[in-house]
């Protein structure tokens, strides 16, 4: 009996458990590491003298803006508003600018510019930016009897540049602005080849052809334009001083914010716990900074930066590491949105899921006192929808399935993140700035959001599809379009560019009165589109963040502007 119950002391034979083969994305390490932690330990305070000077300069500029507009002063005020906006300080003067441009609308209606191409174009752009649906028919007067733009305009470089910038405000069926874009691009390219003697103007031409004002990030444009404006002999010295001062004051705030986020990220120990993913905390903060740089959005920026950083880890888990079975488990846990679901996850997924739940719980608690914690539920649902789309793509990849292009878009526009990001960007904004109905608007995929997802997705697919296919990835839009239509890669890109151009027109249309939601909310979506346009302009600058992206971040978060 005893021998029958005895247990052998020899260890049981080991099971031959084979580690799953995982793709190797081989992302480079963080460019910034702990660089910004120094701003947490030694925060720079704004001294009373600087603060006083800032207020004095602001008041001087305000007085210049509130003077009544007349025909004689119209050009001066238009130039002042344009400079204020491009220097990144318009947020101080929203009310005054709105009043001035309302008066400028009357001058527009009275057709006071005659044959001045520069002024006509400038007024058109500023009024369109303000949401006024002014007619582009005004540019007909610059055409000859053959219906072409007058050749004499080719000598007016400043006017051509102004017209070029105005064409980027076009909406659908504005053929004259399409013609103007083609005309001005051709002429301005000739200006570059001819080596214009006015080097400051030449610099602006090169800059504009690379990234027009409508598509530029406010903060980066400010950094660039300060260097241009100070070389302008007719510049407003008060405005120049104020812009430099304001830039540096805001930079100190932004440095402290990214320091806070770096400390949070360091405590998560991402580089060790999630070594397969892109370590891009500072780049994610830069993304949030693109959405809103103004001081009143500090809470929103930090929330948005954390959300984007976590979503980036989840994205890489689906694209670059997780097995089909593991991703199904994570999707189920996310859809349940229950911390207890963590027990079903592989060990490496648990820190990400835990922090995702904790982050949204913390946001909800922070907003509770303001009576706006309801916002977090909208944000959660947008994240769940995106993760579900990630999993749909994982199923396609697992089954070696290449969908039709339209079928692909139904999922890929959600997985782009640009349906989720606008909703989440609203969450941390002030109580009175985002009415409840704005969350219903943004979460129902309105035209503005739909257009932004098209731009984000197609820009991504154009520049990233070859690298993604090399490492093993679901078919991108390029492959789907090529297969369905028997097209070449070049033909697919041409079609994508057409759709991106059309989406920009949708965005411009949505920013004209009557507005679906307040302009400052539309600007959040617009800024996200501007960021993604920059993001993919020279390849994938997020994945490969050690070149252009590093330079952009350094110019805004490291290098101050000499006064």
Curated annotation (Swiss-Prot):
Keyword Metal-binding appears in the UniProt entry: yes
Q: In which tissues is it expressed?
A: Predominantly expressed in root.
- Entries under Pfam families matching the protein: Terpene_synth, Terpene_synth_C
What is the protein's species of origin? Valeriana officinalis
Q: What does the entry list as the binding residues for Mg(2+) 3?
A: 468
GO molecular function terms noted in the UniProt entry: germacrene C synthase activity; germacrene-D synthase activity; magnesium ion binding
Q: Which family does it belong to?
A: Belongs to the terpene synthase family.
How the cofactor is bound: the record states:
Binds 3 Mg(2+) ions per subunit.
**What keywords is this UniProt entry annotated with?**
Lyase, Magnesium, Metal-binding
Q: Where is this motif: DDXXD motif?
A: 315-319
What this protein needs as a cofactor is:
Mg(2+)
EC number from the UniProt entry? 4.2.3.60, 4.2.3.75
List every stretch annotated Disordered.
1-22
- For this entry, the protein name equals Germacrene C/D synthase
InterPro entries for the chain? Isoprenoid_synthase_dom_sf (IPR008949), Terpene_cyclase-like_1_C (IPR034741), Terpene_cyclase_plant_C1 (IPR044814), Terpene_synth_N (IPR001906), Terpene_synth_N_sf (IPR036965), Terpene_synthase-like (IPR050148), Terpene_synthase_metal-bd (IPR005630), Terpenoid_cyclase/PrenylTrfase (IPR008930)
Q: Which residues are noted in the entry as Mg(2+) 1-binding?
A: 315, 319
Q: What does this protein do?
A: Mediates formation of germacrene C and germacrene D using farnesyl diphosphate as substrate. Can also catalyze formation of trace of germacrene B.
Q: Catalytic activity, per the record?
A: (2E,6E)-farnesyl diphosphate = germacrene C + diphosphate; (2E,6E)-farnesyl diphosphate = (-)-germacrene D + diphosphate
Gene Ontology biological process terms in this record:
diterpenoid biosynthetic process
Per UniProt, Mg(2+) 2 binds at 315, 319
Top EC category: lyase
């Amino acid at each position: 009996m005893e021998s029958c119950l005895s247990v052998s002391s020899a260890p049981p034979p080991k099971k031959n458990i084979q580690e799953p083969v995982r793709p190797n994305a081989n992302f480079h390490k963080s460019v910034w590491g702990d660089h910004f932690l120094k701003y947490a330990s030694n925060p720079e305070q704004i001294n009373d003298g600087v603060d006083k000077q800032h207020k004095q300069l602001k008041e001087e500029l305000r007085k210049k803006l509130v003077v009544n507009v007349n025909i004689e002063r119209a050009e001066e005020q238009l130039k002042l508003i344009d400079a204020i906006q491009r220097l990144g300080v318009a947020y101080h003067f929203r009310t005054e600018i709105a009043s001035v441009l309302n008066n400028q609308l009357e001058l527009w209606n009275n057709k006071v510019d005659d044959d001045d191409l520069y002024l006509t174009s400038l007024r058109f752009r500023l009024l369109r930016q303000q949401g006024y649906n002014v007619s582009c028919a005004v540019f007909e007067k610059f055409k000859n009897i053959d219906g072409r733009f007058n050749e004499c305009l080719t000598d007016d470089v400043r006017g051509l540049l102004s017209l070029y910038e105005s064409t980027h405000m076009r909406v659908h069926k504005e053929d004259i602005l399409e013609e103007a874009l083609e005309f001005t691009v051709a002429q301005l390219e000739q200006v570059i080849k001819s080596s214009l003697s006015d080097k400051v103007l030449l610099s602006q031409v090169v800059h504009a052809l690379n990234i027009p004002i409508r598509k530029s990030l406010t903060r980066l444009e400010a950094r660039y334009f300060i260097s241009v404006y100070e070389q302008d002999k007719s510049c407003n010295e008060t405005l120049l001083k104020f812009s430099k001062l304001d830039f540096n004051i805001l930079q100190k705030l932004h440095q402290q914010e990214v320091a806070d986020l770096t400390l949070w990220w360091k405590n998560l120990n991402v580089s060790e716990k999630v070594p397969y993913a892109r370590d891009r905390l500072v780049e994610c903060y830069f993304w949030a900074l693109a959405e809103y740089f103004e001081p009143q959005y500090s809470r929103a920026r930090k929330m948005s930066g954390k959300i984007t950083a976590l979503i980036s880890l989840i994205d890489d888990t689906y694209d670059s590491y997780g097995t089909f079975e593991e991703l199904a488990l994570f999707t189920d846990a996310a859809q349940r949105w229950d911390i207890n679901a963590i027990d079903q996850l592989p060990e490496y997924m648990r820190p990400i899921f835990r922090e995702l739940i904790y982050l949204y719980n913390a946001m909800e608690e922070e907003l509770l006192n303001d009576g706006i914690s309801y916002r977090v539920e909208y944000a959660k649902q947008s994240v769940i929808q995106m993760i579900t789309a990630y999993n749909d793509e994982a199923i396609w990849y697992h089954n070696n399935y290449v969908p039709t292009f339209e079928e692909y878009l139904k999922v890929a526009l959600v997985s782009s993140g640009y349906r989720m990001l606008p909703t989440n960007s609203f969450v941390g904004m002030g109580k009175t700035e985002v009415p409840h109905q704005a969350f219903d608007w943004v979460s129902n995929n309105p035209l503005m959001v739909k257009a932004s997802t098209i731009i984000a997705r197609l820009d991504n697919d154009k520049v990233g599809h070859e690298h993604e296919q090399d490492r093993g990835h679901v078919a991108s839009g390029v492959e789907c379009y090529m297969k369905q239509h028997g097209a070449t890669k070049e033909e697919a890109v041409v079609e994508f560019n057409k759709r991106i151009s059309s989406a920009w027109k949708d965005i411009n249309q949505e920013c004209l009165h009557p507005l679906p939601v307040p302009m400052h909310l539309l600007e959040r979506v617009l800024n996200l589109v501007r960021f993604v346009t920059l993001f993919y302009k020279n390849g994938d600058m997020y994945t490969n963040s050690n070149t252009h992206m590093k330079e952009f971040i350094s110019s805004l978060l490291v290098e101050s502007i000499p006064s």
